[in-house]
Each structure stands twice: as structure tokens, then as C-alpha cells.
């Protein structure tokens, strides 16, 4: 083994995300001398990231080298780790298209990156590019491990392991560890005192056990405390990012009904189910404080904040950041050194969760060490949780089949099976919506869709 790994970042123009991941990497002793290859098709954004990464590296006392690439295969050559984080079509035009076309057809969305027409279109735009990365990896770094952060996570991960089963990859999200920290904050307890077991699908996994350590070293179930805090109006706390639009009511109400807390945010969960966003039901939007059009608003704000941050980074002598909650550096360190760690990853369901479809993409705890990323068996999850997940897996199954077999009919079927879409639109309206989305996206979508 070489003394230091090569880490390739595809989509390195996502500077804020690069900063978080590589800020963690540079503080790990075994990774300090890594060769970091930054790749993006946008040369301006690439140069911005280079400035930030160089200062991060110097500030952390890391001694590796940085190379910048607009050619993907060159960036991937002999890589040990491949971090993927990009958005095909960006906020403009593609995200705007997903929201505006759906709205014209009477379908409101909040985030639109995981399920529903927005998630379906994003998958169709994204998967061909992920496949090209797999092709290049097969040729120039076949032993590398891909750490995929691109949404829609389940469909993307599924499409890659279905077509390129030899590529070592895991889909990563921060919702499991992020929500655990959020719940600890709601109860004014130290996140380090938590112990939990979580399982499901990406953006719809549930804490099957959620406990905290007491003074005498024993663990107690945290759910009764959490429910009492919500009923007393003491939880949830105001949004940690200062976003007053996102008040987390949906998840707590679902917790009361289901008995288990879900990992992804209220604004996400509201559009994965048929109960919260309906035509003419402004009362539901008000009661559950559902932030419609949240993702476009967030994109505009983040872009404005980034320009301000970038100017500060350009003039700063040092860039010092706190550790992020992302798993990437933990995985790299465990694979490179053999020092074991546990992360939550999105992987193929091969006997991991018994009552979800085998072959579907599930999110479970994984042991990571020199043997690789090893998912752990969960067994059977509560039937009502599995039933809810199945409604989302239906969409993922059909969309993945659509793109693997180039079958346009399955795209309509995937949209028909989406719980939120089906609760709002009739069948003919769903077909018309899909037709308009395909026409509006044009060349951003695969050619077979437009034949």
C-alpha cells in the first residue's frame, strides 16, 4: 500500500461541500499527505475550490498535493477514493424547471430531490453521468471506493450497483447522524450520550432503538422523554440553521402516530407521503408548517451566502473549520488504516432487511475496516414502517427499471406510484405532467426518452 491515498473529488465546484469533506480529511493523520484531485467542468468554480482547499490544507498542517482537472478520466487515474457530489442541470435551469412545471400542473413540492416528479427527473438526468464515472473507474481505478453523495440517493445507488456490480460504492447522507444530534439538542442532552439503531431507506429510515446513557452507565429509552417534550411544547427547538420556514412539525406528528422517529427532515418527509400537501388544503400547510418551494429558496440564499464567504476566504490567511458530521473521512481512514468504524450507508439489500424487497437500496449500519464496507443485518423491521417504505421503493423500482431498460412507459408508472403525486393528480394529469417535464428538460435527459 502507498503511504498516502489519492482522493478524487468529482463535482469539486460544490465548494462548501468540498470544504467540509476535505477539512475533515486534512485533520486525519493517515490522510494528511493525500493527493487530492479536484475535478469539475466549471473552471471558475474549480479555481474557487482550489483556493479554499489549499488554505484548508495549509491551515491543518497537511502536506499533500492538489491537482485540478476538467477531464474526468485524468482526475480518476489511480484514485483510491472517489467522492461524488454534483447536481446535473444545477439550480438553473433544471431545479427551477422541476418546480415550475409541476406547479403549473397543480403539484406543489418542497425539496424535489428524492422522490416524486422532481426526484424522478433528477434521477434521469443524473444516472447516465454516474454510469460514466463507473466506466472510467473500471478503466483507470478499478479498486477505488466511490463515496456517493448525489441525490436521489436510493435510485442513483441502485442504478450503479445494478449495472456496475464490480464497483465498490456506498451512498452517503447525513440524515441519520444529523437527526440524532438534532434530537439530543431538542432534549438538551449531549449527543455523545446517545445510542441508537437505525434502518430503512434513504430519507425514510427510522430509529428502531433510541437510547441515552445515564449517570450509572445504563441506557434508557429516549422516546418517552421526546414525546413528553413535544407535548409540552419544549420540542422541537428552533431550526439550528436559523431557517424559520422549517419547523419540524411533520416528523414529530409522524412520531406520535408511528412510535418511531424518522431520519430525514419534515420538509422532505412531507412530500414522500400523501397526507400533507394537497390542492386546496391550505389548512394542512398551515397546521404542519410545510415549507412549499423550500429548495429553490434555499438555493438562492446559499448562492448569495457563498459569494460573501468566498470573498472572505480569498483574503483570509487561514481557514479553520470545525469537524463536520459527514462520514467520508471516517470511511477513508478506516479503509486505509484498518482502524474499524461504523457508519450508516446506502447499499444493496442482500438479506439485510428481511421485509423489504431484496435487491432494493437500503440504509443500514456498516462496519468499515481493511476488509471494506460491510453492511450489518437488521432482520425484520416493524410492519407499518416497512409498508410506508414500500410506497417509496415502488417508485425507485420502476424508475430504476426505466433507465436500465430504456423504457419510457416505466417513467410514467413511477410517477403514478408516487404517494404525493397520486394524492393530488389523476392518471391523465400525471401523464401530461411527465410529458411536459420531458419536453421542458430536453437535452438534459437521455436521448431514448425523447424518441
What is each stretch, according to the model?
Residues 77, 83-84, 148-149:
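Redox-cofactor binding/interface segments in oxidoreductases and associated redox assembly factors
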Residues 7-32:
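N-terminal Rossmann-like dinucleotide-binding module
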Residues 65-78:
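Short acidic low-complexity segments
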Residues 92-163:
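Rossmann-fold NAD(P)-binding glycine/threonine-rich loop
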Residues 30-54:
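NAD(P)-binding Rossmann-fold cofactor-contacting core
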Residues 29-31, 56-63, 164-165, 187-189:
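Short helix-capping segments at alpha-helix termini
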Residues 132-214:
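Internal, well-ordered domain-core segments that constitute the primary functional module
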Residues 188-451:
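Long, compositionally biased stretches enriched for glycine and/or charged residues
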Amino acid at each position: 500500500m502507498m503511504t498516502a491515498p489519492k482522493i478524487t473529488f468529482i463535482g469539486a465546484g460544490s465548494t462548501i461541500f468540498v470544504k467540509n469533506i476535505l477539512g475533515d480529511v486534512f485533520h486525519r493523520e493517515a490522510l494528511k499527505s493525500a493527493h487530492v484531485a479536484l475535478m469539475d467542468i466549471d473552471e471558475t468554480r474549480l479555481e474557487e475550490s482550489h483556493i479554499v482547499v489549499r488554505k484548508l490544507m495549509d491551515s491543518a498542517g497537511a502536506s499533500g498535493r492538489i491537482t485540478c482537472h476538467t477531464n474526468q478520466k485524468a482526475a480518476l487515474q489511480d484514485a483510491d477514493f472517489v467522492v461524488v457530489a454534483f447536481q446535473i442541470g444545477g439550480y438553473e435551469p433544471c431545479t427551477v424547471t422541476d418546480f415550475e412545471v409541476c406547479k403549473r400542473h397543480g403539484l406543489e413540492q418542497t425539496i424535489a430531490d428524492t422522490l416524486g416528479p422532481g426526484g424522478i427527473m433528477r434521477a434521469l438526468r443524473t444516472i447516465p453521468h454516474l454510469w460514466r464515472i463507473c466506466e472510467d473507474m473500471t478503466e483507470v481505478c478499478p479498486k477505488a471506493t466511490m463515496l456517493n453523495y448525489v441525490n436521489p440517493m436510493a435510485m442513483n445507488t441502485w442504478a450503479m450497483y445494478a449495472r456496475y456490480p464490480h464497483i465498490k460504492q456506498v451512498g452517503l447522507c447525513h440524515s441519520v447522524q444529523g437527526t440524532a444530534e438534532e434530537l439530543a439538542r431538542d432534549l438538551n442532552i449531549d449527543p455523545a450520550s446517545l445510542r441508537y439503531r437505525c434502518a430503512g431507506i434513504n430519507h425514510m429510515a427510522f430509529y428502531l432503538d433510541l437510547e441515552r446513557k445515564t449517570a450509572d452507565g445504563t441506557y434508557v429509552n429516549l422516546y418517552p422523554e421526546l414525546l413528553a417534550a413535544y407535548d409540552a411544547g419544549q420540542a422541537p427547538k428552533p431550526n439550528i440553521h436559523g431557517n424559520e420556514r422549517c419547523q419540524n412539525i411533520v416528523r414529530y406528528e409522524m412520531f406520535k402516530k408511528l412510535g418511531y422517529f424518522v431520519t430525514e427532515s419534515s420538509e422532505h418527509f412531507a412530500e414522500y407521503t400523501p397526507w400533507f400537501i394537497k390542492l386546496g388544503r391550505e389548512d394542512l400547510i398551515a397546521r404542519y408548517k410545510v415549507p412549499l418551494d423550500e429548495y429553490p429558496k434555499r438555493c438562492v440564499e446559499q448562492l448569495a451566502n457563498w459569494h460573501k464567504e468566498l470573498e472572505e476566504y480569498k483574503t483570509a490567511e487561514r481557514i479553520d473549520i470545525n469537524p463536520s458530521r459527514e462520514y467520508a473521512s471516517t470511511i477513508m481512514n478506516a479503509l486505509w488504516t484498518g482502524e474499524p468504524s461504523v457508519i450508516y450507508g446506502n447499499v444493496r439489500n442482500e438479506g439485510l432487511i428481511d421485509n423489504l424487497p431484496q435487491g432494493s437500496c437500503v440504509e443500514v449500519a456498516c462496519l468499515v475496516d481493511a476488509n471494506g464496507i460491510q453492511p450489518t443485518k437488521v432482520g425484520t423491521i416493524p410492519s407499518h414502517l416497512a409498508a410506508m417504505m414500500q410506497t417509496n421503493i415502488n417508485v425507485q423500482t420502476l424508475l430504476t427499471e426505466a433507465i436500465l431498460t430504456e423504457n419510457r412507459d416505466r417513467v410514467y408508472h413511477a410517477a403514478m406510484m408516487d404517494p404525493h403525486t397520486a394524492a393530488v393528480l389523476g392518471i391523465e394529469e400525471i401523464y401530461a405532467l411527465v410529458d411536459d417535464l420531458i419536453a421542458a428538460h430536453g437535452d438534459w435527459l437521455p436521448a431514448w426518452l425523447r424518441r
